[in-house]
Amino acid sequence: MIYTVTLNPSVDYIVHVEDFTVGGLNRSSYDTKYPGGKGINVSRLLKRHHVASKALGFVGGFTGEYIKTFLREENLETAFSEVKGDTRINVKLKTGDETEINGQGPTISDEDFKAFLEQFQSLQEGDIVVLAGSIPSSLPHDTYEKIAEACKQQNARVVLDISGEALLKATEMKPFLMKPNHHELGEMFGTAITSVEEAVPYGKKLVEQGAEHVIVSMAGDGALLFTNEAVYFANVPKGKLVNSVGAGDSVVAGFLAGISKQLPLEEAFRLGVTSGSATAFSEELGTEEFVQQLLPEVKVTRL
């Protein structure tokens, strides 16, 4: 079973405004909303690949109810923990440029987190737990390490799609998969990475430090997969960037869908990269049909 963890989910409110004026009254030409959060995105994409998962995390208030209802209508299994306060709202303002205003989210108490952590005692050997997104400010910086340790005690596999301070300690958690982009990879080693060639030695280091699989996304330049045995490169299909939100999560979901379907590793990687592109070229998360349409354009080569 695949479990996704979103500690600080959101309702993403996307507003399109033409001729935006700062300090004046603006009217949207189009707006929509849907559940946000990297783990939730992974669950939603897995569903589109016909792979089951269960979404975990903290929700509260009317916005939390919206998320649960929305995912229920998509036939997604959830086991969210209820907290006081409202799940945050993140505003994505599209005016030609894209501006984001992210809410803080509710306070999570020590008791809330302790009860949440107990869920992982029921994991089975071989289960996959995806830890994705930001850590709420009310939780300690080592929150992901605590969850990863609880997973390891049950011989479950951990996937990390995280950033910031938590990413710096990612390899200590011995993840089954981690997925930094090239900027994050550079930050981990105190350097700037601008090309595939520059990324290769640092991706290899992450494997040497304990990660089983590492996918490094290089935006329009493709993506790299590192394992103990080999390094693979995948190009990305041509298309217009429409949506940067959720593309990396889609790579994770596509790769895990391929693993769940017991595809060869290169094919799972190819499915992941294509899934990321399908989302990047869409207003929302990419559909299965769009992924299949783009799949022939993506080629995987061993470096």
Curated annotation (Swiss-Prot):
Residue stretches spanning the membrane: none
Keywords assigned by UniProt, alphabetized: ATP-binding, Kinase, Nucleotide-binding, Transferase
Assigned EC number: 2.7.1.56
Keyword match Transferase: yes
Sequence positions that bind ATP: G248, D249
Highest rank taxon of the organism: Bacteria
Catalytic residues, chain numbering: D249
Residues in coiled coil: none
UniProt enzyme class: transferase
Catalytic function, reaction form: beta-D-fructose 1-phosphate + ATP = beta-D-fructose 1,6-bisphosphate + ADP + H(+)
GO molecular function: 1-phosphofructokinase activity; ATP binding; phosphofructokinase activity
GO cellular component labels: cytosol
Function comment: Catalyzes the ATP-dependent phosphorylation of fructose-l-phosphate to fructose-l,6-bisphosphate.
Family under the similarity heading: Belongs to the carbohydrate kinase PfkB family.
Name of the protein this chain belongs to: 1-phosphofructokinase
Natural source organism: Bacillus subtilis (strain 168)
Taxonomic lineage: Bacteria, Bacillati, Bacillota, Bacilli, Bacillales
Protein encoded by which gene: fruK
